[in-house]
Protein backbone atom coordinates (compact mmCIF):
# COMPACT_ATOMS: atom_id res chain seq x y z
CA UNK A 1 0.00 0.00 0.00
CA UNK A 2 1.42 3.38 -0.97
CA UNK A 3 1.74 6.13 1.63
CA UNK A 4 -0.93 8.06 -0.30
CA UNK A 5 -3.48 5.31 0.44
CA UNK A 6 -2.17 4.27 3.84
CA UNK A 7 -4.13 5.02 7.00
CA UNK A 8 -3.16 5.17 10.65
CA UNK A 9 -4.77 5.62 14.05
CA UNK A 10 -5.81 9.00 15.36
CA UNK A 11 -7.30 7.77 18.59
CA UNK A 12 -9.98 5.28 17.56
CA UNK A 13 -10.39 6.90 14.14
CA UNK A 14 -8.53 5.87 10.99
CA UNK A 15 -7.10 8.85 9.11
CA UNK A 16 -4.84 9.18 6.06
CA UNK A 17 -1.21 8.62 7.02
CA UNK A 18 -0.09 12.14 6.14
CA UNK A 19 -2.93 13.79 8.12
CA UNK A 20 -2.17 12.41 11.59
CA UNK A 21 0.74 14.76 12.22
CA UNK A 22 -1.46 17.78 11.45
CA UNK A 23 -4.26 16.53 13.69
CA UNK A 24 -1.90 15.81 16.59
CA UNK A 25 -0.40 19.28 16.12
CA UNK A 26 -3.87 20.76 16.48
CA UNK A 27 -4.39 18.92 19.76
CA UNK A 28 -1.17 20.21 21.31
CA UNK A 29 -1.51 23.76 20.01
CA UNK A 30 -4.86 23.73 21.81
CA UNK A 31 -3.67 22.33 25.14
CA UNK A 32 -0.15 23.81 25.43
CA UNK A 33 -0.98 26.76 27.69
CA UNK A 34 -2.60 24.57 30.37
CA UNK A 35 -0.66 21.36 29.72
CA UNK A 36 1.14 21.30 33.09
CA UNK A 37 -2.04 22.04 35.05
CA UNK A 38 -3.94 19.30 33.23
CA UNK A 39 -1.13 16.80 33.83
CA UNK A 40 -1.34 17.45 37.56
CA UNK A 41 -5.13 17.18 37.59
CA UNK A 42 -5.39 14.11 35.35
CA UNK A 43 -2.73 12.08 37.17
CA UNK A 44 -3.31 13.52 40.67
CA UNK A 45 0.33 14.62 40.48
CA UNK A 46 1.62 11.08 40.03
CA UNK A 47 3.22 11.97 36.67
CA UNK A 48 5.93 13.73 38.68
CA UNK A 49 6.82 10.43 40.39
CA UNK A 50 6.93 8.62 37.04
CA UNK A 51 9.27 11.28 35.64
CA UNK A 52 11.42 11.23 38.77
CA UNK A 53 11.90 7.47 38.36
CA UNK A 54 12.80 7.99 34.70
CA UNK A 55 15.44 10.56 35.61
CA UNK A 56 16.85 8.19 38.24
CA UNK A 57 17.25 5.48 35.58
CA UNK A 58 18.82 7.80 32.99
CA UNK A 59 22.42 7.45 34.11
CA UNK A 60 23.03 11.08 33.12
CA UNK A 61 26.29 12.56 34.41
CA UNK A 62 28.12 15.87 34.26
CA UNK A 63 29.33 16.66 30.75
CA UNK A 64 26.75 14.48 28.99
CA UNK A 65 24.76 15.44 25.91
CA UNK A 66 21.06 14.71 26.50
CA UNK A 67 18.09 14.84 24.15
CA UNK A 68 14.66 15.29 25.72
CA UNK A 69 12.51 14.37 22.75
CA UNK A 70 8.86 15.44 22.57
CA UNK A 71 9.95 17.26 25.69
CA UNK A 72 6.97 19.60 25.79
CA UNK A 73 7.07 21.89 28.78
CA UNK A 74 10.47 20.65 29.93
CA UNK A 75 9.95 18.73 33.17
CA UNK A 76 12.75 16.28 32.37
CA UNK A 77 14.95 18.80 30.57
CA UNK A 78 15.04 21.02 33.64
CA UNK A 79 16.41 18.24 35.83
CA UNK A 80 18.87 17.16 33.14
CA UNK A 81 20.25 20.72 32.93
CA UNK A 82 21.16 20.46 36.60
CA UNK A 83 22.69 17.01 36.14
CA UNK A 84 24.93 17.72 33.13
CA UNK A 85 26.29 21.02 34.45
CA UNK A 86 27.80 23.70 32.26
CA UNK A 87 30.15 21.15 30.68
CA UNK A 88 27.21 19.25 29.21
CA UNK A 89 24.28 20.14 26.99
CA UNK A 90 20.56 19.42 26.96
CA UNK A 91 18.43 19.72 23.85
CA UNK A 92 14.72 20.12 24.48
CA UNK A 93 13.03 19.08 21.25
CA UNK A 94 9.39 19.01 20.27
CA UNK A 95 7.60 18.95 16.93
CA UNK A 96 5.00 21.39 18.26
CA UNK A 97 6.00 25.06 18.34
CA UNK A 98 3.41 25.96 20.98
CA UNK A 99 4.66 23.32 23.40
CA UNK A 100 8.26 24.32 22.74
CA UNK A 101 7.54 27.98 23.45
CA UNK A 102 5.84 27.10 26.74
CA UNK A 103 8.81 24.92 27.69
CA UNK A 104 11.36 27.58 26.77
CA UNK A 105 9.60 30.27 28.79
CA UNK A 106 9.17 27.97 31.78
CA UNK A 107 12.81 26.83 31.89
CA UNK A 108 14.19 30.32 31.26
CA UNK A 109 12.14 31.63 34.18
CA UNK A 110 13.62 28.85 36.32
CA UNK A 111 17.13 30.00 35.43
CA UNK A 112 17.92 27.14 33.07
CA UNK A 113 20.26 28.89 30.62
CA UNK A 114 23.66 28.34 29.03
CA UNK A 115 23.53 24.57 28.69
CA UNK A 116 20.20 24.09 26.94
CA UNK A 117 19.02 24.47 23.36
CA UNK A 118 15.49 24.33 21.93
CA UNK A 119 14.96 22.52 18.64
CA UNK A 120 11.68 22.01 16.78
CA UNK A 121 12.07 18.59 15.20
CA UNK A 122 10.18 15.53 14.00
CA UNK A 123 11.13 12.39 15.94
CA UNK A 124 10.97 10.38 12.73
CA UNK A 125 13.88 12.30 11.14
CA UNK A 126 16.01 13.82 13.87
CA UNK A 127 18.37 16.57 12.60
CA UNK A 128 21.34 15.46 14.68
CA UNK A 129 24.59 13.61 13.86
CA UNK A 130 25.01 9.87 14.33
CA UNK A 131 26.24 8.72 17.75
CA UNK A 132 25.78 12.15 19.36
CA UNK A 133 23.78 11.80 22.59
CA UNK A 134 24.67 9.99 25.81
CA UNK A 135 21.00 9.75 26.76
CA UNK A 136 17.68 10.23 24.97
CA UNK A 137 14.30 10.42 26.65
CA UNK A 138 10.80 10.60 25.22
CA UNK A 139 8.11 11.05 27.83
CA UNK A 140 4.44 10.57 26.90
CA UNK A 141 5.24 11.45 23.31
CA UNK A 142 5.81 8.25 21.34
CA UNK A 143 2.14 7.34 21.10
CA UNK A 144 1.50 10.57 19.17
CA UNK A 145 4.12 9.81 16.51
CA UNK A 146 2.78 8.60 13.17
CA UNK A 147 5.61 6.17 12.37
CA UNK A 148 6.82 4.89 15.72
CA UNK A 149 9.26 2.40 14.18
CA UNK A 150 10.94 5.16 12.21
CA UNK A 151 11.16 7.37 15.30
CA UNK A 152 12.74 4.62 17.39
CA UNK A 153 15.28 3.92 14.63
CA UNK A 154 16.08 7.64 14.44
CA UNK A 155 16.63 7.74 18.19
CA UNK A 156 18.95 4.75 17.99
CA UNK A 157 20.95 6.37 15.19
CA UNK A 158 21.75 9.53 17.17
CA UNK A 159 22.51 7.67 20.42
CA UNK A 160 26.17 7.11 21.26
CA UNK A 161 27.47 3.57 21.77
CA UNK A 162 27.25 3.03 25.51
CA UNK A 163 24.24 5.34 25.77
CA UNK A 164 20.66 4.60 26.66
CA UNK A 165 17.22 5.67 25.45
CA UNK A 166 14.26 5.82 27.82
CA UNK A 167 10.65 5.69 26.67
CA UNK A 168 8.13 6.67 29.35
CA UNK A 169 4.63 6.04 28.08
CA UNK A 170 1.15 4.94 29.04
CA UNK A 171 0.80 1.20 28.67
CA UNK A 172 -1.48 -1.73 29.51
CA UNK A 173 -2.56 -2.20 33.16
CA UNK A 174 -1.60 -5.64 34.43
CA UNK A 175 -4.40 -5.81 37.04
CA UNK A 176 -7.85 -6.51 35.47
CA UNK A 177 -9.84 -4.48 38.02
CA UNK A 178 -7.46 -1.54 37.64
CA UNK A 179 -7.89 -1.72 33.87
CA UNK A 180 -11.68 -1.36 34.17
CA UNK A 181 -11.46 1.55 36.59
CA UNK A 182 -8.82 3.21 34.43
CA UNK A 183 -11.00 2.92 31.33
CA UNK A 184 -13.92 4.54 33.11
CA UNK A 185 -11.71 7.36 34.33
CA UNK A 186 -9.99 7.91 30.98
CA UNK A 187 -13.06 8.04 28.78
CA UNK A 188 -15.31 10.00 31.13
CA UNK A 189 -13.20 12.09 33.50
CA UNK A 190 -10.46 13.20 31.10
CA UNK A 191 -12.76 14.77 28.49
CA UNK A 192 -14.79 16.35 31.30
CA UNK A 193 -11.67 17.91 32.83
CA UNK A 194 -10.57 19.04 29.38
CA UNK A 195 -13.89 20.75 28.82
CA UNK A 196 -13.85 22.51 32.20
CA UNK A 197 -10.19 23.58 32.27
CA UNK A 198 -9.31 24.12 28.60
CA UNK A 199 -12.76 24.28 26.93
CA UNK A 200 -11.53 21.40 24.75
CA UNK A 201 -13.08 18.01 25.50
CA UNK A 202 -12.19 16.58 22.08
CA UNK A 203 -8.43 16.88 22.56
CA UNK A 204 -8.62 14.91 25.79
CA UNK A 205 -10.92 12.36 24.22
CA UNK A 206 -8.16 11.83 21.64
CA UNK A 207 -5.51 11.55 24.37
CA UNK A 208 -7.54 8.83 26.12
CA UNK A 209 -8.05 6.95 22.87
CA UNK A 210 -4.40 7.27 21.87
CA UNK A 211 -3.38 5.57 25.10
CA UNK A 212 -5.53 2.54 24.25
CA UNK A 213 -4.08 2.30 20.74
CA UNK A 214 -0.46 2.45 21.91
CA UNK A 215 1.53 -0.83 21.84
CA UNK A 216 1.61 -2.82 25.06
CA UNK A 217 4.76 -3.48 27.06
CA UNK A 218 6.01 -6.55 25.19
CA UNK A 219 5.17 -5.14 21.76
CA UNK A 220 7.08 -1.92 22.41
CA UNK A 221 10.00 -3.90 23.79
CA UNK A 222 10.23 -5.84 20.51
CA UNK A 223 9.85 -2.64 18.49
CA UNK A 224 12.88 -1.21 20.28
CA UNK A 225 14.91 -4.32 19.51
CA UNK A 226 13.85 -4.07 15.87
CA UNK A 227 14.98 -0.42 15.83
CA UNK A 228 18.49 -1.48 16.83
CA UNK A 229 18.54 -1.15 20.60
CA UNK A 230 20.22 -3.75 22.81
CA UNK A 231 19.27 -5.24 26.17
CA UNK A 232 15.81 -3.67 26.16
CA UNK A 233 14.01 -3.84 29.48
CA UNK A 234 10.92 -2.29 30.97
CA UNK A 235 9.51 -1.43 34.37
CA UNK A 236 5.79 -1.15 35.08
CA UNK A 237 4.62 1.77 37.17
CA UNK A 238 1.28 2.14 38.94
CA UNK A 239 0.16 -1.35 37.97
CA UNK A 240 1.16 -0.99 34.32
CA UNK A 241 -0.78 2.21 33.66
CA UNK A 242 2.64 3.52 32.69
CA UNK A 243 5.76 1.64 31.63
CA UNK A 244 9.36 2.81 31.35
CA UNK A 245 11.28 1.08 28.57
CA UNK A 246 15.07 1.37 28.46
CA UNK A 247 17.14 0.41 25.45
CA UNK A 248 20.93 0.50 25.24
CA UNK A 249 23.31 0.82 22.30
CA UNK A 250 26.55 -1.14 22.19
From Swiss-Prot:
Listed under GO biological process in this entry are:
aerobic respiration; menaquinone biosynthetic process; methylation
Alphabetical list of Pfam families matching this protein:
Ubie_methyltran
Q: Which reaction does it catalyse?
A: a 2-demethylmenaquinol + S-adenosyl-L-methionine = a menaquinol + S-adenosyl-L-homocysteine + H(+); a 2-methoxy-6-(all-trans-polyprenyl)benzene-1,4-diol + S-adenosyl-L-methionine = a 5-methoxy-2-methyl-3-(all-trans-polyprenyl)benzene-1,4-diol + S-adenosyl-L-homocysteine + H(+)
Q: Which CDD domains match?
A: AdoMet_MTases
What are its E.C. numbers? 2.1.1.163, 2.1.1.201
The UniProt keywords, alphabetically, are: Menaquinone biosynthesis, Methyltransferase, S-adenosyl-L-methionine, Transferase, Ubiquinone biosynthesis
- Pathway assigned to this chain's UniProt record: Quinol/quinone metabolism; menaquinone biosynthesis; menaquinol from 1,4-dihydroxy-2-naphthoate: step 2/2; Cofactor biosynthesis; ubiquinone biosynthesis
- Function according to Swiss-Prot or TrEMBL: Methyltransferase required for the conversion of demethylmenaquinol (DMKH2) to menaquinol (MKH2) and the conversion of 2-polyprenyl-6-methoxy-1,4-benzoquinol (DDMQH2) to 2-polyprenyl-3-methyl-6-methoxy-1,4-benzoquinol (DMQH2).
Q: What is this protein called?
A: Ubiquinone/menaquinone biosynthesis C-methyltransferase UbiE
Organism expressing this protein natively = Francisella tularensis subsp. tularensis (strain SCHU S4 / Schu 4)
Amino acid sequence: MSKENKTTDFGFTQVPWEEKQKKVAGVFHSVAAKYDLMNDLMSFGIHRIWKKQTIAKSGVRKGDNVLDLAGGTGDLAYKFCQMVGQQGKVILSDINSSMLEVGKEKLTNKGCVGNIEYVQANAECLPFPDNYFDCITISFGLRNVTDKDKALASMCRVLKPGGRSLVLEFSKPIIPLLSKVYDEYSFKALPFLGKIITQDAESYKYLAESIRKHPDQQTLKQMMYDAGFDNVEYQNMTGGIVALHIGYKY
